[in-house]
Curated annotation (Swiss-Prot):
Organism whose genome encodes this protein: Mus musculus (Mouse)
UniProt topology in membrane: Multi-pass membrane protein
Protein name in UniProt: Solute carrier family 41 member 1
Cystine residue pairs: none
Biased composition range(s): Basic and acidic residues: 1-11
Amino acid sequence: MSSKPEPKDIHQPNGTGPTPSPCSSDGPGREPLAGTSEFLGPDGVEVVVIESRANAKGIREEDALLENGSQSNESDDVSTDRGPAPPSPLKETSFSIGLQVLFPFLLAGFGTVAAGMVLDIVQHWEVFQKVTEVFILVPALLGLKGNLEMTLASRLSTAANIGQMDTPKELWRMITGNMALIQVQATVVGFLASIAAVVFGWIPDGHFSIPHAFLLCASSVATAFIASLVLGMIMIGVIIGSRKIGINPDNVATPIAASLGDLITLALLSGISWGLYLELKHWRYIYPLVCAFFVALLPVWVVLARRSPATREVLYSGWEPVIIAMAISSVGGLILDKTVSDPNFAGMAVFTPVINGVGGNLVAVQASRISTFLHMNGMPGENSEPTPRRCPSPCTTFFSPDVNSRSARVLFLLVVPGHLVFLYTISCMQGGHTTLTLIFIIFYMTAALLQVLILLYIADWMVHWMWGRGLDPDNFSIPYLTALGDLLGTGLLALSFHVLWLIGDRDTDVGD
């Protein structure tokens, strides 16, 4: 019969490779192969066909995950190309996770140390003394690395891991769309952060200055725009390079985003605000002109972001987490403003970027890894787990045998040795205004451990919760988590300094 070879041609490309069976030689039993419900052979044959399809499917998925550039060009249906229980995205041990995370973590930490040293110096500048609302901008703008750059890194890492950046055309579309998107977000968030700084500075004191408000707006928007442009380009290079040398971008992209993010952003904020402050007495019209220039560029970035399907949805629906995260970080900025403005707590400035940066870096790595794991198994809104996930217990988050729990343990264990290295570096550089006594280190480490413990637990719950409601965690979870890291870090550090002051540890002259 002419229809005999057709079933073979259909099954062989899918990897089934059928072997001869009693039924295959039976002519009448072959015709119904198009529909298994009419198959006349024994049940065992039907099971073998189904299992071989699943196995071939699993092989294709694992090859796509573990080999660089091995994505098939076949236009398989995504909905049917996933098995019910696909393998883990990456075969990683605790040692391999720690080895890949360690160097970027230390690099990011030294970046936060440098940012802390910068903040420790610029807090004595006239612009920070006269316009103290600039302190409120610090966590909000440093948080842009969580709102924008880390979200960008997580999106691109996921896209690279699932093969959406394998061809030059896909790569270029992903780059242009995402760069335009973060410029739109940076401009809007910078403007809103300045409004929050003005409001938070006006409410406690009841004092409002229009020139200072324009200064904050121009400084915030210019800093956000330039920092996002520079860091976005760095992130793209890091992710492309990671894929080429066989490193999981999830482990390195987000920490490297933060390694230079804090330093570049804080240096830009200090330099721009100082330069604009010098013009306050001579040419006040420069402030509205700076704001108008960056606002005029918005339509260009919007058009470019709308052209890419990967960023079009985020352009319309991705504002809520970014804006709320900015507001949360601004509350942390208010705490920083009220604490650092007190000469008794001047030593807090150098440690704030460090504790906030380390906590945000670690939780961003974990959120990006969980998000990639979920993307490997389905699409947002699909429940790939046998039982629906509720609020997890701490034991499930930190002590279960799965790869995400393993990475949570590794990241948590990095906190103490990492902070000890960073504190020692600050001490060697004669930074800060606080002597690193044993009691101070104990209080500082307690605050850092508590911050990361809470963040990792919230990340485990939040990423799965957003996934179950059809929200992409790459776009929604990291802004919330890094903003919470800023708030928790600043709040716990301020509490530690107040307790140390109450019990008699009142060093404020170190580094003067």
